[in-house]
């Protein structure tokens, strides 16, 4: 591992941090250390990192802004690549937008709305990066990334870089091919938006932001929606009807504001959260006969 660290530093791939606590990089404020954390400063840095990872036969994981993640208390084995400053380029040409995978989604939706571009209003309250949003087909307010993405530039595990069209992304509810069938890193996304009326777009954005502020506990560390909605039900409704609102294990609590959110009240461990998730799953199955599936991504040792 020491030799790999030295080569990464010599290759100037970006910031190289050893045994770095990942709680600093997630909105849940939970997570043990990454053996090696890379914050690349350019695409070439990511490519070189993957070359070295392959050379040393080391496991690797990619994270964005950590908004939909629960990282193990034991951390993550191998190399963790965090997308951010090195992939935050933006190009707007009429209604076509090309943006780096590390660009903040809320910042992008706000900027484009002020330019009178419609289609990304649903993302006005979704924390995280563009790359993470494409990876999981993030959405809200009856819309999602699949409605606006035309193609995405992907760096695959074998080091090849290629564009995947909308059809090739295999989008479904909170899912894309990048999660299982074709693992890779979203370097860039191209969105097709619509030219609209600036005042109306900004108004919708504000309405969405206000709704989130009033109904979701973003004033506490959390990871967004914990469960996918089990059609035709809403996960939060089932959890609240089961009487679990406010239930707490350790420092992790089912939000009083929204049943599908688990908040870190202070000092929560990943195990606290996992115990709550298991309790919710079993309770909902026993009471309503419904299987619950997590939307939050659970990673690590």
From Swiss-Prot:
GO MF annotations in UniProt: FAD binding; UDP-N-acetylmuramate dehydrogenase activity
Q: Key word DNA damage present in the record? A: no
Which cofactors are named for this entry? FAD
Active-site residue numbers? 174, 225, 295
- Pathway listed: Cell wall biogenesis; peptidoglycan biosynthesis
Keyword Cell cycle in annotation: yes
Q: Which Pfam families match?
A: FAD_binding_4, MurB_C
Q: What class of enzyme is it?
A: oxidoreductase
Q: Name the protein family.
A: Belongs to the MurB family.
Q: Kindly give the HAMAP family that the UniProt entry links to this protein.
A: MurB
Name the record gives this protein: UDP-N-acetylenolpyruvoylglucosamine reductase 1
* Recorded name of the encoding gene: murB1
């Amino acid at each position: 591992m020491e030799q790999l660290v030295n080569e990464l530093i010599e290759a100037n791939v970006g910031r190289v941090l050893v045994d770095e606590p990942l709680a600093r990089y997630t909105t849940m404020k939970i997570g043990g250390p990454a053996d090696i954390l890379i914050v690349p400063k350019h695409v070439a840095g990511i490519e070189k990192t993957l070359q070295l990872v392959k050379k040393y036969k080391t496991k690797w994981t990619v994270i964005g802004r950590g908004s939909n993640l629960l990282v193990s208390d034991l951390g993550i084995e191998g190399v963790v690549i965090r997308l951010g400053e090195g992939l935050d380029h933006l190009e707007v040409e009429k209604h076509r937008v090309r943006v780096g995978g590390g660009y903040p989604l809320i910042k992008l939706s706000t900027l484009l709305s002020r330019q009178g571009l419609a289609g990304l209003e649903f993302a006005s309250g979704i924390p995280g990066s563009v790359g993470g949003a494409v990876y999981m087909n993030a959405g809200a307010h009856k819309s999602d990334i699949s409605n606006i993405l035309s193609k995405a530039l992907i760096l695959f595990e074998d080091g090849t870089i290629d564009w995947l069209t909308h059809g090739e992304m295999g989008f479904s509810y909170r899912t894309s091919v990048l999660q299982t069938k074709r693992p890779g890193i979203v370097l860039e996304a191209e969105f097709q938006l619509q030219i609209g009326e600036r005042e109306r777009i900004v108004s919708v954005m504000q309405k969405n932001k206000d709704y989130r502020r009033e109904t979701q506990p973003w004033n506490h560390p959390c990871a967004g929606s914990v469960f996918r909605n089990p059609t035709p039900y809403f996960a939060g409704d089932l959890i609240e009807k089961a009487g679990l609102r406010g239930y707490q294990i350790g420092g992790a609590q089912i939000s009083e504001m929204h049943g599908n959110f688990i908040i870190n009240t202070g000092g929560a461990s990943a195990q606290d959260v996992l115990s709550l998730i298991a309790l919710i799953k079993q309770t909902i199955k026993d009471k309503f006969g419904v299987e619950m599936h997590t939307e939050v991504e659970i990673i690590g040792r």
